[in-house]
Every structure is written in C-alpha cells, then in structure tokens.
C-alpha cells in the first residue's frame, strides 16, 4: 500500500477444475480494499459482489488501513463486511494492515478494539486467524494465515518455511480441496 487510491475496482473471473470439489462453487475474493469506498456505504462494490452470486466470499487481508491518518473509514469497511455476509458466508484472514493495527494497540486510540469488536458480532463472518474451516457441501477447507509483521518487511525478506507454515496451520487435508488465504503486500 503506497497511499495511491483507485476510484474503480476490477472484476476478474477465473475458472478452475479441482476434482476434490464435490459440486460447482463460485467464490468472490476481495483483497486490499484499504478502506476504499465505492459509492455511498460501498454500495457499488456490494452490488457487484451480489451480481456474481458467490457461494462464499474470501477476504485475504488489508481490508482496513493501519495509518492513523487514514482510519476514518474503518467503520464503513466493517459495515461493508457485515453487508457481505448477507450475500454469502465470509471468510476473513488478516493482512499486514490488520496485523499492524493489532500489534500497535497502544497507538490506536481503541481503533483495533472497536473494529474487532464490531466484527465479532457479525453472523456468518468466519475469522480465520491461523485456523481453518471445513465447508462440507463442497469438500473445501479454507485456511487463514496470520503472519507476524516480520514477514512483511520490504527490504529484508524473511522466507516462510514449510515447517513454520505447518506449525501455524497444521497439515493440509489431502482428501479436501484446500484454499489458503494468505496476504502478500508486494
């Protein structure tokens, strides 16, 4: 995130075949929203998501912004996530901005507590913080990886070893289609 804002979002469609998925599955993935607002209360974004008729919505992080000067829309973003759950179940993992806000609690003036408390009350929102959920109808496991900030350094890259990943998430389920929500800010 370099502070540049896009006034438009882009819809990209991919088709995948995985024989472990029991029936057709439509996923909407929204990442790096960075508190951007598309129309009043993000109605343009929500309408576009609804038009796609997803079975689930995946949010692999950076929905909010941790910079103090740009946090004014955190509540709008949280409300957008709440409205997404009216379209389909939402699976959310943290990115570097959520992690940054969480780790800098003393500097946030209660911003993280307010945001996370609001999210906790949302029905059909599944927070995946180094955890996974099995979704029976499709035979899919959705994993959410929450990396420490050390993995987000831009100049000194810290490799993520497989044993570290396994210690954080456990072993992948070989009989299921496994989906990993992991944020990479580059």
Where are these regions (language model features)?
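Glycine-centered flexibility motif
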Residues: 1, 87-89, 144
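Acidic, histidine-bearing metal-coordination/catalytic regions of metal-dependent phosphoesterases
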Residues: 1-28, 34-35
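Intrinsically disordered, low-complexity regions enriched in small/polar residues
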Residues: 3, 40, 93-94, 134, ...
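Short secondary-structure boundary/capping elements
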Residues: 8, 40-41, 160-163
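A generic secondary-structure signal marking the coil-to-beta-strand transition
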Residues: 12, 23-26, 90, 138-141, ...
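Short, composition-biased local secondary-structure segments
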Residues: 16, 80, 84-86, 92, ...
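Conserved catalytic scaffold of divalent metal-dependent phosphoesterases
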Residues: 20, 33-35, 98-186
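Membrane-embedded segments
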Residues: 22-126
């Amino acid at each position: 995130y370099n502070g540049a804002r896009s006034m438009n979002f882009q819809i990209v469609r991919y088709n995948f075949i995985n024989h472990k998925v029991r029936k057709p599955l439509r996923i909407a993935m929204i990442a790096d929203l960075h508190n951007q607002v598309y129309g009043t209360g993000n109605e343009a974004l929500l309408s576009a998501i609804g038009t796609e008729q997803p079975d689930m919505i995946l949010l692999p992080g950076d929905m909010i912004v941790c910079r103090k000067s740009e946090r004014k829309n955190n509540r709008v973003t949280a409300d957008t996530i709440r409205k997404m759950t009216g379209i389909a179940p939402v699976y959310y993992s943290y990115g570097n901005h959520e992690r940054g806000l969480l780790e800098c609690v003393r500097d946030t003036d209660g911003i993280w507590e307010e945001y996370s408390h609001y999210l906790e009350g949302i029905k059909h929102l599944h927070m995946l913080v180094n955890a996974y959920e099995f979704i029976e109808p499709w035979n899919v496991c959705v994993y959410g990886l929450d990396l420490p900030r050390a993995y987000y350094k831009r100049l000194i890259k810290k490799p993520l070893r497989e044993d570290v990943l396994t210690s954080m998430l456990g072993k992948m389920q070989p009989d299921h289609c496994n989906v990993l929500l992991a944020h990479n800010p580059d």
